[in-house]
């Protein structure tokens, strides 16, 4: 596809969003949060759909895994600080606050209550597809492979995958070789994490 000009790799972050927004490309795989940017572009006629899948694969489509930013609470602080953190997290988790955040940014609401509140408000009727990221995450009961990722050195592992994909996109490696190399390199990273945390 790349050789025929049907696929263009725009980079690891959100550079593809700009190409889509300008009309340079017809399709983009993007974060749920890209909806806010696309909505601001009044000249852009766009819609949002399920991630493509092979319908001949047993159980397809499965849930996509959650990504995006996280809030972390670190150890070693004073009890009063944790009380403040707890109040802040409780505030962020309120259905009304989550609905506002979700409808403004496009990011997925963090509770079922906030999703239901958004649905009942008519937001999804007025913004078709805005609930697609929620549907992709909750399509089925989670499997071992769709519960989300939690492992040490995640960022380094993701970088390996990105490097190997870039080698395929540039025509430097075939998909099988890149996948095998990604597995080997990522496993090496995991072994180092395991050794450092015994």
Predicted regions and their residues:
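Extracytoplasmic/periplasmic substrate-recognition and gating elements
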Residues: 1-8, 39-108, 141-146, 173
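Long, aromatic- and glycine/proline-rich binding clefts that accommodate carbohydrate-like moieties
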Residues: 103-163, 167, 197-198
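Short, low-complexity disordered leader/linker segments with a strong preference
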Residues: 177-180, 184-198
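Soluble non-cytosolic domains of exported or imported proteins
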Residues: 14, 79, 83, 151-155, ...
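Secretory-pathway/luminal and periplasmic proteins that interact with or process carbohydrate-rich
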Residues: 27-29, 97-100, 187-193
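A short structural micro-motif
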Residues: 19, 55, 143, 184-189
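Short, charged, surface-exposed loops that flank catalytic or proteolytic processing sites
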Residues: 167-180
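Extracytoplasmic ligand-binding clamshell segments of periplasmic binding protein
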Residues: 1-41, 83, 178
